[in-house]
């Protein structure tokens, strides 16, 4: 993962971890790798991983079980809300970009549909 020097690394990791949850890479109820393992994988200080994971827990997306480790929440409603938020963020970026290009809504949607069908179907 390439980090943006303009933003705190723990926030970038927080976004990465939320994406893993919202896309199902980290499933509801699944045990998350240890802080040390994640720090090694992302090549960052364990304290940075801990800070991102603590924020996930504060938001209710993970829970720590005293002797078992850290797990993704079983609350599927919360995960669904996270999926919605992730989609809205991407949609906002697309709409902002289309507006910056002075595209009409219908043209932007048609262009996206055509591009999707040509490149991703």
Predicted segments with their positions:
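Short, mixed-charge, low-aromatic patches
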Residues: 6-12, 45-54, 65-72
């Amino acid at each position: 993962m390439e980090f943006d020097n303009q933003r705190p690394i723990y926030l970038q990791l927080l976004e990465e971890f939320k994406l893993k949850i919202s896309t199902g890479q980290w499933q509801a109820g699944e045990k998350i790798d240890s802080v040390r393992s994640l720090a090694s994988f992302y090549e960052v200080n364990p304290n940075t991983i801990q800070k991102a994971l603590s924020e996930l827990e504060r938001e209710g997306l993970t829970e720590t079980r005293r002797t078992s480790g850290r797990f993704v929440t079983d609350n599927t409603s919360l995960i669904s809300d996270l999926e919605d938020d992730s989609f809205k963020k991407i949609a906002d970026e697309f709409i902002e970009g289309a507006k910056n290009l002075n595209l009409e809504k219908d043209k932007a949607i048609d262009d996206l549909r055509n591009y999707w069908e040509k490149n991703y179907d």
